[in-house]
Amino acid sequence: LADMGATIIKEERLTPYSLRYEIKYDKDLMAFSKKIESVPMVEILSIGKSLELIKDIGDAKQVCDRYGLSKIKGTHAIGHARMATESGVDIKSAHPFWGYPFSDVAVVHNGQLTNYWNNRRALENKGMRFMSECDSELIAVYLAEKMRNGATLAEGMKDSLKGLDGVFTYFVATKDSLGMAKDTMAAKPLVLYESDNLIAM
């Protein structure tokens, strides 16, 4: 990382197969991430200025303990316990998803997108990248592409209701916003809980 011009502020080995770095880097993140991933057997699970994505296999408690989530400070978080029906059970296919190279957006999703491949090919032709074959990732990449081109999160989400087809509910986080969207049939549930010190969906 230092050879690429990054200043390493903090380095942690979280598991035998994952590292967390806090770095200072003021240049092009896309070029930086491509250089890192040119190293054999190395893959970036998230990179950004304000969000950290933690992806792994296991139940919520196992993942929380493994990555020390109780010690992380922040204003909001999203998580997902997934029963895979259409894609692999591996770290790449675990939620949340981010939209490479627009990094500060994270999505969790329930449902099925029926126009996944058409949308994926169109986004890949625009230079967007996919790391899995999970249809949920499409939502993150779709929103990232809209926001990269100047749309607000709300505008991107509104557009997604026209551009994505299927039965779905999704929840999205950025550095300063949370949002949710459902398809027009609204067949996939989303439950809201609110107390004096917690709002949970």
Task: Please identify what each model-predicted range represents.
Residues L1-M201:
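Conserved short alpha-helical segments that host acidic/polar catalytic motifs at enzyme active sites
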